[in-house]
């Protein structure tokens, strides 16, 4: 009977600790923060100002590891080892988000970015920031919004993630196990600093523009598939091109397509922005096949934002 009582007490204590941790993690880190979306439009139409900028958010991958069974899961209990490249006698992994736990990066395939388009009509200033990440928690987004509002007077800052499945974990559910966060605190701070810096730079780059808006609702149908019934998807590609009035040059473009950036799939161990990298490169610099130019690029900086991908839309 005493053992039963002791056991129940231990279980109760564990439940209390779990509930306390759960409640703590769900707390509002910004109780004073609120958003006022009541916007008074200008009395008369005026000039529209737009600015673009981009800042790298590529992590530094130091320690690597030895995937003896080739399943892209770090399993030291199976005899797998790490390479202490920085010589600090511990494993310093960059956990890749998406698909499954225990997927430490082995290197970098292409850079990750925080890309920003700022729009200002003289009365309201809005920043659209897209980061190469699987997702971004609200409280972390508020950190960026508060900085952007305080430093450069952005009325509203939209934080969008490309939802790439080959970037570091910024959510906290793709670490060493289901019970250990995969978020690297230093990297998180770096992403926030770089995103704010990109917003600041985009504001400095504000110039009068004209906008061209286009869409192709059918051309990308062969490249997206709904992997779950019922078959519902939005295959359309949409673009807003900002052209500087004075020079006639393209400052940048905001493009959107609804698809999961997961073409490299679950056994990839290299940091990558996946297909958004090539999407952006093509819009900026053109489509090439070897040395042959197939389509002219628009120039400027391309900001890619994802669309409705849940359900589940993936590359075909």
Q: What is the predicted function of each stretch?
A:
Residues 4-9, 17-316:
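Conserved beta-alpha junction segments in alpha/beta enzyme cores
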């Amino acid at each position: 009977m005493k053992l039963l009582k002791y056991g129940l007490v231990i279980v109760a204590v564990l439940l209390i600790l779990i509930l306390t941790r759960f409640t703590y993690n769900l707390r509002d880190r910004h109780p004073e923060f609120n958003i006022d979306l009541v916007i008074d439009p200008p009395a008369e139409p005026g000039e529209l100002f737009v600015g673009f900028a981009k800042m790298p958010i590529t992590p530094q991958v130091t320690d690597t590891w030895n995937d003896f069974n080739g399943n892209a899961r770090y399993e030291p209990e199976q005899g797998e080892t790490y390479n202490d490249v920085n010589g600090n006698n511990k494993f310093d992994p960059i956990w890749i988000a998406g698909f499954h736990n225990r997927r430490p990066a082995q290197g970098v395939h292409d850079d990750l970015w925080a890309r920003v388009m700022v729009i200002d009509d003289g009365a309201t200033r809005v920043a659209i920031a897209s980061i190469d990440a699987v997702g971004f928690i609200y409280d972390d987004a508020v950190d960026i919004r508060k900085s952007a509002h305080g430093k450069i007077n952005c009325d509203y800052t939209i934080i969008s993630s490309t939802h790439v499945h080959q970037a570091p974990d910024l959510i906290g559910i793709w670490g060493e196990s289901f019970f250990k966060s995969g978020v690297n605190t230093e990297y998180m701070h770096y992403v926030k600093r770089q995103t704010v810096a990109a917003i600041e730079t985009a504001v400095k780059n504000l110039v009068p523009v004209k906008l061209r808006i286009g869409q192709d609702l059918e051309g990308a149908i062969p490249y997206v598939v709904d992997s779950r019934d019922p078959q519902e998807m939005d295959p359309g590609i949409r673009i807003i091109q900002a052209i500087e009035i004075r020079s006639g040059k393209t400052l940048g473009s905001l493009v959107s397509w609804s698809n999961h950036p997961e073409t490299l799939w679950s056994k990839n161990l290299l940091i990558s922005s996946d297909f958004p990298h090539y999407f952006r490169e093509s819009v900026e610099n053109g489509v090439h096949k070897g040395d042959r130019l197939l389509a002219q690029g628009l120039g400027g900086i391309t900001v890619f934002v994802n669309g409705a991908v849940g359900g589940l839309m993936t590359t075909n």
